[in-house]
Curated annotation (Swiss-Prot):
This is Peptidyl-tRNA hydrolase. GO terms for molecular function: peptidyl-tRNA hydrolase activity; tRNA binding. Transmembrane segments: none annotated. TRNA binds at Y15, F66, N68, N114. SUPFAM superfamilies: Peptidyl-tRNA hydrolase-like (SSF53178). Keywords: Cytoplasm, Hydrolase, RNA-binding, tRNA-binding. It catalyses: an N-acyl-L-alpha-aminoacyl-tRNA + H2O = an N-acyl-L-amino acid + a tRNA + H(+).
Length: 188
């Protein structure tokens, strides 16, 4: 069985440390811990790393399409590698959770997250796993766009990093046992 873990974010140095790039940050850490490197796959508009974990093929994917078009990269990769959407996990930022809180879900709506909305649209299904990493709501007077495209202030930086570590621990646990429900029970 082949699995794919996608980290959502925006490409480029300008966005590297923004809240919207929590998925990229978590996937970068997971790739480092699995000792794999990303390479650009231009036909799929993505950075892709691959390895085997417990005898199963694993693809790590960072779409280069910008957040709101993530599905345009994810859907063709799933089709090309013949991966069922139930074996897809998407890591992303979550406005509705406090900074650093990690929540795992097996399916559902986008919850207003435009990258997830794009994946749902292009994959044609809501039945894929999600790892939501909390970034909190905007402070009074700040727009959602400005909030997600800003970095973490000093008081939240460490809490956000802890969330990334927890998300990666959850993915390593999932890759070891292959059971997302069991992973949800342990990490939610």
């Amino acid at each position: 069985m082949t699995k794919m873990i996608v980290g959502l974010g925006n490409p480029g140095d300008k966005y590297e440390k923004t809240k919207h790039n929590m998925g990229f940050m978590a996937l970068d850490l997971l790739a480092k811990e699995l000792n794999v490197d990303f390479k650009e796959e231009k036909p799929f508009m993505s950075l892709v790393a691959s390895t085997f974990v417990n005898g199963e093929k694993l693809f790590l994917v960072k779409p280069l399409t910008f957040m709101n078009e993530s599905g345009r990269a994810v859907a063709p990769l799933l089709k090309y590698y013949n991966i069922d959407e139930a074996d897809l996990t998407v890591m992303h930022d979550d406005l509705d959770s406090p900074v650093g809180r990690v929540r795992l879900r097996q399916k559902g709506s986008s919850g207003g997250q435009n990258g997830i909305k794009s994946v749902i649209t292009h994959v044609g299904s809501q039945t894929f796993n999600r790892v939501k990493i909390g970034i909190g709501r905007p402070k009074h007077g700040m727009t959602v766009v400005n909030h997600v495209l800003s970095g973490f202030d000093n008081e939240d930086k460490e809490i956000a990093q802890d969330g990334i570590f927890k998300a990666v621990d959850a993915m390593k646990f999932y890759l070891e046992n292959g059971d997302f429900q069991k992973t949800m029970n342990k990490f939610n």
